[in-house]
Amino acid sequence: ALVSQAENYLEEHGAWQITISPLLLTAALSAKPLRQEIATFRQAISKVAGFPVILATYNDAEASSFVHHADVATLSQQGPVTPDHVIRTKRVPLLGKDVESYRIAYETYFKEHSKRTELSLTMLDPAPRVILDAEFGLLTVGRNAQEANIVHDMYRHTMAIILRATALEKYQAQPITDVFDVEYWELEQAKLHLKQNLPMFAGEIALVTGAASGIGKACVESFLARGAAVVGLDINPAIEKLFDRPDFLGIRCNLTSESEIYQALDKTAKTFGGIDMLVLNAGIFPSAKRIDSLSLDEWRKIMNINLDSNLIVMREVYPFLKAAPKRGRVSIIGSKNVPAPGPGAAAYSASKAALNQLARVAALEWGKDGIRLNILHPNAVFDTGLWTEELLQARAAHYGLTVEAYKTNNVMQIEVTSRDVAELAAEMCGPLFAKTTAAQVPIDGGNERVI
């Protein structure tokens, strides 16, 4: 009842409806892509924070209206709506992009107010959680996607409250001393001294191509399980609803289209702030065809999907990887056909071998930027969309084997699954492979021809 009374009072006094300039609405809809600038900005914030962060960008009309408010420099620096918001949002947003100045101001704020207590306080990280920038819009920061979303929700409410209070009379936050006391109360300090078992990829972003099924989907699951935010690209529209969670973004994307790749990367930058890890998995395995019956059109189609599209993705993701707070990493899903090609697979084998060479050259060129690339060569992974039960039975019968024997037809006599491949792809982006680049690792249970 009290809330309704307050809302009615604001409405009666012309302070409830927040007006948005038509010019700002047009500007928000036509905002230019700033993916590389956003990734570099995320790198700067992560450096001040001391850990990788998720950076979400909003340049819609409502956010732009607040960011471009004539008095934003005063209104936004009053403090949070309630002192407890400070735990999520910090006391005030960063205005503009000068993260270093924000760090200095935060350290000064801590020194001044920590003197009032006899307790020995540990300063929290001095990175902003909310940024208001004329070019980027409203940005929110978190150690994971959910945290960044919570900060966003809180500050959306804060913007509305500030604008309505200003329209009515004046916005007045709680005293800075009260805000500091909540930010540095005992429980929050105790959390700092607890051993934090953060996931391996907390605050980092992985991009996986061909992510709607098979090895690609398993890669998404493996990276999510390690705490990464994951962007999945696939030509199958099912990718958009693959997982309903804040740390996953599925984008329908034809990887042979440069413009669709650009759009996907723009959306990635706006949603999470960058890319730290790349898994190149998308590709096709055509039906067997010998060289004497292989048309140039078929050859070019396979090369376009398995090779050319990966070149475009690598080229366009490179600036993201270069700006990764913990250095960029790439896992490439190769094939047993690179070291051991088979008859009837000329185009596929050649495309995978060419991708292998591309990765090796990239390792040479990108090493100076701290980016590492490693290659997995799987074989006989049967739990993918390529293999139906009928096809499995036919291939097993061709070799005079049962389906189970066919699945385990390797020197270790074990089955290799999509999850096995995905787990290795994820570990290759982890600390165990920190000093390794351009490695080629078979994951096939031991193929005699590869050995």
Regions found by a protein language model. Name each.
Residues 289-291, 295-300:
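Substrate-binding pocket helix/loop in short-chain dehydrogenase/reductase
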Residues 285-288, 432-433, 437-451:
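Short C-terminal tail/terminal secondary-structure segment
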Residues 335:
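Residue(s) in the substrate-gating loop at a strand-loop-helix junction
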Residues 319, 364-365, 434:
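Alpha-helical segment proximal to the catalytic Tyr-Lys
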